[in-house]
Amino acid sequence: MADEMETKGEKKYKYSIIIPTYNERLNIAIIVYLIFKHLRDVDFEIIVVDDGSPDGTQEIVKQLQQLYGEDRILLRARAKKLGLGTAYIHGLKHATGDFVVIMDADLSHHPKYLPSFIKKQLETNASIVTGTRYVKGGGVHGWNLMRKLTSRGANVLAQTLLWPGVSDLTGSFRLYKKSALEDVISSCVSKGYVFQMEMIVRATRKGYHIEEVPITFVDRVFGTSKLGGSEIVEYLKGLVYLLLTT
């Protein structure tokens, strides 16, 4: 589907997929396989930004490089955990695509949606296409009621205070025109999970065209969630900061 749309537009675009990792040894090979499966006719590269995982994630990525090629799988490791926001910035420095996709490594963002992201962008010429759990066709699988209420509440609070123009402000599965991402990311100051929220708010304030694609978010299959109390506090601080500065 994505390849057909590219052909109609004549130009063959390249996509850089940035995947930050920390202790994702059990997931990274699966998500890479699924990306190749769903983007068979698309020109893309996968940039893995690993923050010094002690579980052997980097060794698995190196094996994937031997299988798929170092030109398709790029490992850009860092010595320690430096924050999600800086991981995107680090990956962006090495991206050679016309577009940049950011997604999680834990299989909560299924690569089967990537063709829909690409199709939506090509049809609308949007600067940003973001996945949303909160429109018809979207949803969440694997969360308990408390987690769903917390996520929904955080999103409603942000919507009420910030008016971002998108239905899922706290989502982190997005496609950007590279030039738009470079512009937006240069004005962001957050480093952790609130970075995603800041990027979409800054993009809205700058007037970028944003489209949405419904997705079903699936709770991680292997490993444990890295979202805890400190991230919730960080989110609330970030919300106040954005309210005062945007």
UniProtKB/Swiss-Prot annotation:
GO terms for cellular component: dolichol-phosphate-mannose synthase complex; endoplasmic reticulum; endoplasmic reticulum membrane. Disruption phenotype: Reduced root growth. Slight reduction of chlorophyll content. Wrinkled seed coat. Hypersensitivity to ammonium. PROSITE patterns: DNA_POLYMERASE_A. CDD domains: DPM1_like. Its EC number is 2.4.1.83. InterPro entries: DPM1-like, Glyco_trans_2-like, Nucleotide-diphossugar_trans. Gene3D superfamilies: Spore Coat Polysaccharide Biosynthesis Protein SpsA, Chain A. It holds the Pfam family Glycos_transf_2. It is a peripheral membrane protein. Transfers mannose from GDP-mannose to dolichol monophosphate to form dolichol phosphate mannose (Dol-P-Man) which is the mannosyl donor in pathways leading to N-glycosylation, glycosyl phosphatidylinositol membrane anchoring, and O-mannosylation of proteins; catalytic subunit of the dolichol-phosphate mannose (DPM) synthase complex. Plays a role in plant development and physiology, sensitivity to ammonium stress and endoplasmic reticulum stress response. This is Dolichol-phosphate mannosyltransferase subunit 1. It comes from Arabidopsis thaliana. The gene is DPMS1.
